Amino acid sequence: MNRSDTLDLSLNLMRRPSVTPEDHDCQAVMAERLAKAGFQIENMRFDDVDNLWARRGTQQPVFCFAGHTDVVPTGNLDNWNSDPFAPEVRDGILYGRGAADMKTALAAMVVASERFVEKHPNHKGSIAFLITSDEEGPSINGTVKVIETLEARHEKMTWCLVGEPSSTHQLGDIIKNGRRGSLNAVLTIKGKQGHVAYPHLARNPIHLASAAIHELCETVWDQGNEYFPATSFQISNIHAGTGATNVVPGTMAVTFNFRYSTEVTAEQLKERVVEVLQRHGLDYDIVWTHSGLPFLTPVGELVNAATHAIKTVTGVDTQLSTSGGTSDGRFIAPTGAQVLELGVLNASIHQINEHVNVADLEPLAEIYEKILEQLLA
């Protein structure tokens, strides 16, 4: 097996058990490499979260690589074929937590930047890195706090490439040029607890709310558009009752989520839900939490640079997509930056025996380098 710079750095990062919000010196490893390439290093720690802001250059335009060093928990170690934090290459496949999501992309970003700077020491504009250890967790003290800090000092990005694993069947076949918004709610329906044999003395919140819940499930919220699928409503949890078979519950809690397109706003969705609940005469409380606005980067400089780089390196004609969950791109896009996500295959992310093709690592670094060349050389 031929070793590569990208593989070696990937292994170094993957050996560090950086389960969110831990960083385990992953950012220090990256920062050391970047400092040698002329980057100014700034560590931003908020509560228990480590963040790295590194920048080479002081001028516009600014190209930023963004990503996260934290990983999700491993689950039952007995189910892994090898230690998730002792990465192994078997038959050309790199196994370990963070292989796909997203330590190999971090390594590729660093290597691409080193190579680009060596060839173009006087490149135009600036190259930056925004790296957090709070992407897989609550995302409270990570990218969003760094962005707030940068905004306060009027430090802007022009383009941002998030190294999330975007590919589906082969490297570069999909890049995410946007994401849907995410709106969560915990709805509590109030009834009156009682004995099941005396229903006239109780008010069953399950029965009371069933028609309204059915209506919410059947509602067409919008038709989507050329960039986004239609808004989806999904119930994730329902809880009611004491566990006893002879007690009518006093309350029922329903947790649900909207993944919404740019055709509606979070406020419009809230209003429509409240209208349904009130029309059905329910006594309720509802608590909303907003995880992120939808964002879209239309075809332009960044998308064109990425699609051309992918075609040059892999021969693949990439497709643009806004599917999938949220990413930290949702915190960066509102600054006005063009944002897209481009990384390795995502089939094994968050799973037992997470893995990535070793053969994809150097091409990913090449793609990142060619994007830099088109925008900053």
From Swiss-Prot:
Binding site for Zn(2+) 1: H68, D101, E164
Details of cofactor binding: Binds 2 Zn(2+) or Co(2+) ions per subunit.
E.C. number: 3.5.1.18
Catalysed transformations (reactions): N-succinyl-(2S,6S)-2,6-diaminopimelate + H2O = (2S,6S)-2,6-diaminopimelate + succinate
EC category name: hydrolase
A UniProt-annotated Pfam family: Peptidase_M20
Biological process terms in GO annotation: diaminopimelate biosynthetic process; L-arginine biosynthetic process; lysine biosynthetic process via diaminopimelate
Keywords assigned: Amino-acid biosynthesis, Cobalt, Diaminopimelate biosynthesis, Hydrolase, Lysine biosynthesis, Metal-binding, Zinc
Oligomeric and partner information: Homodimer.
Protein name: Succinyl-diaminopimelate desuccinylase
Upper lineage: Bacteria, Pseudomonadati, Pseudomonadota, Gammaproteobacteria, Moraxellales
